[in-house]
Amino acid sequence: MKVLVVGSGGREHAICWKLSKSPKVDKIYCAPGNAGIAELAECVDIKAMEFEKLVAFAKENSIDLTVIGMDDPLVGGVVDVFEAERLRVFGPRKNAAILEGSKAFSKDLMKKYNIPTAAYETFTSAKEAKKYLETAEYPIVLKADGLALGKGVLICENKEDALAGVDELMLDKKFGTAGDTIVIEEFMTGREVSVLSFVDGNTIKIMSSAQDHKRAKDGDQGLNTGGMGNFSPSPFYTKEVDEFCKKYIYQATVDAMKSEGRPFKGVIFFGLMLTPKGPKVLEYNARFGDPEAQVVLPRMKNDIVDVFEACIDGTLDKVDLQFEDNACVCVILASDGYPLAYEKGFEIKGMENFKGKDDYFLFHAGSKFNEEGKVVTNGGRVLGVTALGKDLKEARAKAYEATEWVDFDNKYMRHDIGLSLIH
């Protein structure tokens, strides 16, 4: 079969790699893809938001399955456009992708269906938001309602910071229309854990847990990023946590969406906070995380095509989802200066060192071919150096060893991904 993957990051590289392992897949296309994905797939020069062009390409090339990796096209309704043309596509429709597309929607859903989450209020007026902040308890969290590249969340230690945050989101429009509405919620303490799941509208199957490192610098210092590294599974995601979430969060979310007339088919990413009072939902994403996909998919035993098709066809209950009893660590190599200003266009050297090494992966996030055909950096997050091991300690040692195999001029990374768990 022929498969089209939509997106250009490390997540899409991991999806393409997993698809390439399926005996059912003869040919992979990726739109727009990147220089790393080009080794596995034919990259097509169509952007993720060019829905009509994507549909036309899928029809002209008799694509059997399209997989949407990114959040923007999902929230924008790309799945509806494909389905209207009777094309098979993996991902939630627009009316279900709102689970990620609007923080206010997801918070209201959790409140209505008693899914554990932080207390919150929603505001469409900066004046009202500021009035509320006068008597609020601190620290407090401000969130842009819409998509903001994973960076639209501000943790404010005091009233001054919070008032400035309202200005930033609602008046200065730092994230554009994403800040027209904001959610202000209580600050929760505890461990953050990510859990990925497959959903077919009725049934939910949990993949695995993962642990993200959002801050730019070692010791969780610096600015929030899209993620500087990850590992799977998370040792904090215990059997007790799993049982609680299965009882009160996972199926409850799927059922809530169905009750609202918004059946969800695709991947739900649960951002959880393990608080002293039990697990609570921080956020939902309507797709694989990045770099969560890079640490979860290499551990998955199943043929991913079978799972994608079961989600589309509503037969996920018949799938026995299985994962290796191992660990995976991904360390992001970024452009120095990310997530603020950084230079790009530097040649990436040493990629050939990953060839033929079973437990090592080099997932490209921000790379492209320059005019001379050399692979160069093309983003803040450039590469995801990833390794499997029998446990976290081994996987971590292998991943950090492999970060030395590849180089570019302004290479920057965190040195403490997964470190706290090894002492």
What is the meaning of each model-derived region?
Residues 246-268, 285-357, 370:
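Active-site "cap" helix and flanking loop/linker of ATP-utilizing ligase/carboxylase catalytic domains
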Residues 367-372, 376-423:
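Generic C-terminus detector
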Residues 156-293:
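Internal nucleotide-binding/catalytic subdomain
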Residues 1-94:
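ATP-binding N-terminal substructure of ATP-dependent carboxylate-amine bond-forming enzymes
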Residues 4-5, 100-181, 211, 235, ...:
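Active-site nucleotide/adenylate-binding loops and adjacent lid/helix of ATP-dependent enzymes
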Residues 21, 36-38, 60, 90, ...:
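Solvent-exposed alpha-helices and their adjacent loops that cap or buttress functional pockets
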Residues 38-40, 53-55, 98-104, 217-218:
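Short, charged, surface-exposed secondary-structure boundary motifs
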